[in-house]
Every structure is written in C-alpha cells, then in structure tokens.
C-alpha cells in the first residue's frame, strides 16, 4: 500500500479465497477463508493505494478420469459464492480469476460460472490431461530436454523442471552417447 501511494499509483489486487472443504495442493495452501471475507475487505479498504479488482482460487477445474472430462472443483463453487457474497453487499469486482485445466474445451464451462480470467498453462503445450490421446484442439508441442542424473535399482532419474506429473506422460525417447539411436522407454511417476 505504501509503495503504491509513494509511486502515485493505485494497485489492483486479487484476493484468494478458500473454504474449509476445498482441495488445496501441498505447498499451495494460502488465501483468506470465505467466512471472513467482509472483515478482510474492510481491512483492504483502509489501505490507500490498493483496489480490490477481483477474486481467485486454485485449482478451479480438474480432469476427472472416470467422467472423461474436466469438472469444477469445490474451489470453483467457493469462488463463485464469494463473488456472490460480495455482490449482495454492493461490492462489485471486475475479475473472477479461475485458473487450472484451462483449454479450448473448458472455456465454455468457465463462461458458465462467470470467469473473466483463466490461465492457459499446459494447454499452450497441449499437455493437459484431457489431451492424452491428442484429440483436443491444442496440439502437443513440448520438448523436455534433460539429462540422467543417476541410475538406481534399474531405474534412471533425471533433474530438470517441466515434467508435469498429473499430465500422465507414459513414454520418453532417450538418446545416449553410447547408443547413437533414440530408444523409447516407459515412465514411472
């Protein structure tokens, strides 16, 4: 707040909300509990240089293997309830930021819930769980280049970021200096 005022700016902020029954990934637990929303907003209003632009939560959609499609999570319902709660109090927000599993096929679902913003994430590379068969509009376009760090009990391990565990990758192409050809292998997750 003080930095925004010093810079002569009003900084738009998103408020992350959650409810006790929501699904949170380990290490990503954060936000303000929905039932304290009005108290939190009252405190934000006391801070000059800040403007509550919207609400967010994560993950709002997830691939459901049994249903064979992306479905809303309880988090999305919490987010929509928080938006409605604010609207009933006369507080309009400009953004409903609804990240996770965004793709061409999930955009209509996001629109049904009034989402204004989403994140493309793995849809940009076509590596979303919904695209395991390559039948979605997004094209698989990702090369993950790494090196083997060590071998242990018949398995090879590698370093490097970018591997998406929930992406259900099953195969890899391996090129070794000793073997000047590409070898297909199975992945363990």
Stretch-by-stretch model annotation:
Residues 14-18, 159:
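Short beta-strand segments
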Residues 184-189:
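A conserved acidic, glycine/proline-rich C-terminal tail/linker
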């Amino acid at each position: 707040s003080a930095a925004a005022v010093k810079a002569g700016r009003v900084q738009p902020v998103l408020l992350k909300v959650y409810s006790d029954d929501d699904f949170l990934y380990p290490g990503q637990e954060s936000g303000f509990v929905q039932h304290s929303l009005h108290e939190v907003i009252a405190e934000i209003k006391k801070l000059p240089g800040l403007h509550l632009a919207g609400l967010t939560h994560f993950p709002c959609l997830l691939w459901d293997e049994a249903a064979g499609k992306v479905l809303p999570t309880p988090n999305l319902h919490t987010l929509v309830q928080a938006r409605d709660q604010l609207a009933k109090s006369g507080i309009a927000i400009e953004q409903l930021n609804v990240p996770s599993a965004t793709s061409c096929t999930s955009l209509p679902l996001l629109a049904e819930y009034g989402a204004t913003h989403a994140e493309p994430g793995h849809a940009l590379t076509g590596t979303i769980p919904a695209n395991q068969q390559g039948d979605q509009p997004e094209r698989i376009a990702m090369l993950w280049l790494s090196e083997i760090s060590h071998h242990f009990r018949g398995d090879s391990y590698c370093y490097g970021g970018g591997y998406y565990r929930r992406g259900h990758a099953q195969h890899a192409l391996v090129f070794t200096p000793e073997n000047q050809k590409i070898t297909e292998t199975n992945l363990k997750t």
